[in-house]
Amino acid sequence: MKEREKVVRLAKLAEQAERYDDMVEFMKTLARMDVDMSAEERLLFSVGFKKTIGARRASWRILESLEQKVTAGDQPGVTINGYKKKVEDELRAVCNEVLSIIAIHCLPLANSGENVVFFYKMKGDYYRYLAEFSTGTEKKAATDQSLMAYQAWPCAQLFSLLEIMNSPERASQVAKQALDEATAEINSAGVEGYKDSMLMMQLLKENLALWTSELTGGETSKDDDVVMEG
């Protein structure tokens, strides 16, 4: 059995056993083989990290809620804050590791438009997770990076469809859907400072509509508004 196949099989086994930390380690090994991941492999990569980060995000939200219920400076509040910072350190470590792997091993090796789209979306998600608990300049940097990734993956999907299908109309529809999904992700995140990002998303959508109009002879979708919440 080839090493790549063995690692994938072990990752599947770890998933079945709900040992997600092990699953992540196996998929990190695969990513560092510098291969263009198959659909199955990239899903395993994503699921492993999503399970790992998901549990910690849930813990952070619980601690954040508990901290808000105590008086500032009280001993219980100090204890909660210290424990919350420990969880934040774990979140930061996981996010930074995912982003590093995507930047070094995943995007450079992605030969298909589908893979490029997948990893840009994942990149945007993990910068957004960083922004959820960060403050100050760290929060702004994570927010900006998340926006850049979310801007990139709808465009990557559009160009991929144009290349494969030679269908500007269909490509525009799928790219619009991708952009709408990214907008929904940002709206639901409730992260302070994302309103500026939403304005930039609106500009991106307008540019996409204009470009598509040129390709299709002037016909554009009328449903081009981004709904901003919160």
UniProtKB/Swiss-Prot annotation:
GO terms for biological process: protein localization; signal transduction. Coiled coil: none annotated. GO terms for cellular component: cytoplasm. InterPro entries: 14-3-3, 14-3-3_dom_sf, 14-3-3_domain. PANTHER family: 14-3-3 PROTEIN. Is associated with a DNA binding complex that binds to the G box, a well-characterized cis-acting DNA regulatory element found in plant genes. Belongs to the 14-3-3 family. This is Putative 14-3-3-like protein GF14-H. It comes from Oryza sativa subsp. japonica (Rice). The lineage of its organism: Eukaryota, Viridiplantae, Streptophyta, Embryophyta, Tracheophyta.
